[in-house]
Structure formats: C-alpha cells, structure tokens
Amino acid sequence: MSKIIPVMVHHETGEKAQAAGKKNQEYLKYCIAQAKKYNEKVVLLGDEYNKAWCDDWHNANDFITEKWTKFHAVFENLSTYPTAWAEGIFKRFFLILEYLERNSFEECVIIDSDVLLYLNVSEYEPFRHCKVAAETPLLQDFAMLEKGNGLKWKTCAGFSYFTTQGLREFTDFCIDMYANHKDVRSEERRVGK
C-alpha cells in the first residue's frame, strides 16, 4: 500500500469575473466528485458558498499566514487577469503549504477547480522522483526558444505535484522574485505583450 497523497483544491468565489454574478460554479462539484472516485483524500480550501461540496472542506481564510501576507504586500499584477484572479493563482500555494504543514503531509497534488482527475495520485510512481512536477508543453523546451527570449517558456500548475519542501522553496522563490527582482518582472511584462 502506498502513502496517501492528498488532492488539494482551492476555490474562493471572491470578486472573480468568471463568476458572472453567481456565488459558485457548478463545475467545482464535478471536480471534487471526480477526484474522490480515484483518491482517498480530497481537500477543498474554500469559502462559505462551497462548504457543502466536499467532505474535507476547510475555510481558506483559516490558512492565511505571515508568509502569504509578506507575498501579498510585494505582489504586482503583471497579467491581463483581474488582480483578484491573479492573486488567487499564487494564494493557493501559500494556503496549501500551511495546510500541509499543520496536518503533517509530506506531499500533495494541486488541481485547478475545473480539472477532472482520472488518476489515483497516491499510486502514480513518477511523483516519487521529484520535488515539483507540473505540465509544461514539450514544444516549449528552452533549446527551442528564440535566443534571448527565455521568458516565453511557461508551465501550468493546474495539475501539479509538490513535496512540502518543494512548496516551501517555491513560495520563497515567489516572494523573492516580487520583492527583489523587479528588473526580471519588467522584462516578463514586456515579453508578454
């Protein structure tokens, strides 16, 4: 029997533009139900509007930490997304790290709230060989990029694996990038246009 790896979902309605005036989207129910078909532990860090949708629901605000507050203070939205949405992309990593540390988990899989999971992540052997795994399209290999334009490379964390240590290092990296490397972030914005 393998060690249980929790599947983590973060979904707060907040001011998200895609909510179209609704408090929650129906797809979240399907995301949770599908993940539970294959996985023993599925956790939702959510808000009062989705409390009934997952047996292992936790109020996301209970996992706000000093580390998140530090990141939030230096965060600058460089995307075309509304700021609340862009912050949420990063916020989940900080909240999930706190959940893992409080509950003594050594690893997790994080999925977006609109992902349908057809895998028992606890039995997926390739995760045993890394600290972090995320979807990166093959045709975006660094060697295939235009010279001097490495910022076009991107990775999607909509289905990602982290050890707790890997998530600590990633959130430290996020704080450092926004606090101390404005030059790189300015180049990101220029390349992204």
Where on the chain are the PLM-derived regions?
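A short, conserved acidic/glycine-rich loop-to-beta-strand motif
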Residues: 129-153
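Short glycine- and hydrophobic/aromatic-rich loop-to-beta-strand nucleating segment
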Residues: 157-165
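Surface-exposed cleft-lining segments at the edges of enzyme active sites
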Residues: 79-85
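GT-A fold catalytic core of metal-dependent nucleotide-sugar glycosyltransferases
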Residues: 88-134
